[in-house]
Amino acid sequence: MTVTTSSPATAPGRTPGIGRVARVIGPVVDVEFAPDELPEIYQALQVDRTIGDETLTLTLEVAQHIGDNTVRAISMQQTDGLVRGAPVHDTGAPISVPVGDATKGHVFNVLGTPLDVKQIEAETYWPIHRSAPAFDQLESKTEMFTTGIKVIDLLAPYVRGGKIGLFGGAGVGKTVIIQEMIRRVAKEFGGVSVFAGVGERTREGNDLFLEMTEAGVIEDTALVFGQMDEPPGTRLRVALGALTMAEYFRDVQKQDVLLFIDNIFRFTQAGSEVSTLLGRMPSAVGYQPTLADEMGVLQERITSTRGHSITSLQAIYVPADDLTDPAPATTFTHLDATTVLDRAISDLGIYPAVSPLDSNSRILDARYLGQEHYDTAREVQRILQRYKDLQDIIAILGIDELSEEDKILVNRARRIQRFLSQPFFVAEQFTGIPGKFVPLDETIDSFKRLTQGDFDHLPEQAFFMCGGIEDAEKNAENL
């Protein structure tokens, strides 16, 4: 498939020049220009390559000026068939992607070319390299982003315009949470979502697109993919392309946007590959010396401006489970909240399988949430932590060997654990249980009364897969 794009704008005051390919080493291409026609850093270049009878257009991005009127560029596609001396056209602008309503419901590559249809009718294109909002444009107050998901709102609340790290292995419900968040932003808040597949397996991206189509959330979502088999330049820039689409929805259409990045580690990994290709001296553990800078350029654009926000949910792979590795360690400094999915919880059939003890948020504080919310959350965590501490004793000696106080606490903890489950709208077709949106006030009140023992008389099973506490009481009547 030909993946071509034309830059919609030319830098003012300069006529784009034509150069020629001087050297090709994998995805790195050196291009010579006339002295007065040298393109700027991040400028997009285009060159044709021929494979058999087919001619395809490559897009390159200028990365370095190396002297002798030569620039070093990184290709966004495979360079097979590219020859020395081939003419290279300076587009006069950075790589640009379509923005606006035309992007909803479609899948794009890093160049803004649609992958699910032949073309789209986009009126506006924005360059992927943009400045972060000015300091005086930022939203100064810290505000909670209510999801309607009990376990998240109570124990690891999200920040509007913040960055959330999503930790989860295969099969624990990460994709379902992503789909549910997309659906809730669209239906409950009238917002839009943008998904960036960075270093995704092609199969996973295809599955996500089909599942989102079946779940009915694709109409409010734009997807941008740079698959695992594509050159590092593509994987390094695809997150910026998705972020640019999200910025348009925030700044021009004045919408609240949810931005998903899966996986942020692949962004760092691609940057390391590009850095090596450009001949830079590596830093710790072989990562690029510009690691913190590249991460900051991406993360600082994800923020709230006056009244509108981009809230980011980022899947994070931790190499060898080493949290001190420079890649995840650099990401952690930007996160406002972490949501940890636990396989042990999913094995119990409790979904969402969010760990109430491992997940956290910087705004889980009485100053931001109020004293009642904070005290309720801490009491829930205290009870669940005590239950966890007693697990070994229960397994060896049995629950009858516990003190009366601990028996009450264990039974209460099991009710809380099951009440943290919740039916999702996007899973309704599989579970047969209607999805539930639980208001924050109801969540706090329900768990406060649970910790005080107001519902100790209800059977454990009544709390499983229900929304508010009224659902649990109805379930108890039907048991």
Curated annotation (Swiss-Prot):
Membership in a protein family? Belongs to the ATPase alpha/beta chains family.
Q: How does the record describe its quaternary structure? A: F-type ATPases have 2 components, CF(1) - the catalytic core - and CF(0) - the membrane proton channel. CF(1) has five subunits: alpha(3), beta(3), gamma(1), delta(1), epsilon(1). CF(0) has three main subunits: a(1), b(2) and c(9-12). The alpha and beta chains form an alternating ring which encloses part of the gamma chain. CF(1) is attached to CF(0) by a central stalk formed by the gamma and epsilon chains, while a peripheral stalk is formed by the delta and b chains.
Its annotated compartments are: Cell membrane
Q: Which PANTHER family match?
A: ATP SYNTHASE (PTHR15184), ATP SYNTHASE SUBUNIT BETA, MITOCHONDRIAL (PTHR15184:SF71)
Described purpose of this protein according to its UniProt entry: Produces ATP from ADP in the presence of a proton gradient across the membrane. The catalytic sites are hosted primarily by the beta subunits.
State the GO CC annotations: plasma membrane; proton-transporting ATP synthase complex
- GO terms assigned for molecular function: ATP binding; ATP hydrolysis activity; proton-transporting ATP synthase activity, rotational mechanism
InterPro entries, per database record = AAA+_ATPase (IPR003593), ATP-synt_VA_C (IPR055190), ATP_synth_F1_bsu (IPR005722), ATPase_alpha/beta_chains (IPR050053), ATPase_F1/V1/A1_a/bsu_N (IPR004100), ATPase_F1/V1/A1_a/bsu_N_sf (IPR036121), ATPase_F1/V1/A1_a/bsu_nucl-bd (IPR000194), ATPase_F1/V1_b/a_C (IPR024034)
Keyword Nucleotide-binding (UniProt): yes
Reaction catalysis annotation: ATP + H2O + 4 H(+)(in) = ADP + phosphate + 5 H(+)(out)
EC number of this enzyme: 7.1.2.2
| Annotated binding of ATP, by residue | 168-175
Membrane topology of the entry: Peripheral membrane protein
Could you say which enzyme class this protein belongs to? translocase
Q: Which domain of life is it from?
A: Bacteria
Its recorded name reads ATP synthase subunit beta
Per UniProt, which keywords does this protein have? ATP synthesis, ATP-binding, Cell membrane, CF(1), Hydrogen ion transport, Ion transport, Membrane, Nucleotide-binding, Translocase, Transport
- This chain's source organism reads Frankia casuarinae (strain DSM 45818 / CECT 9043 / HFP020203 / CcI3)
SUPFAM superfamilies (UniProt xref): C-terminal domain of alpha and beta subunits of F1 ATP synthase, N-terminal domain of alpha and beta subunits of F1 ATP synthase, P-loop containing nucleoside triphosphate hydrolases
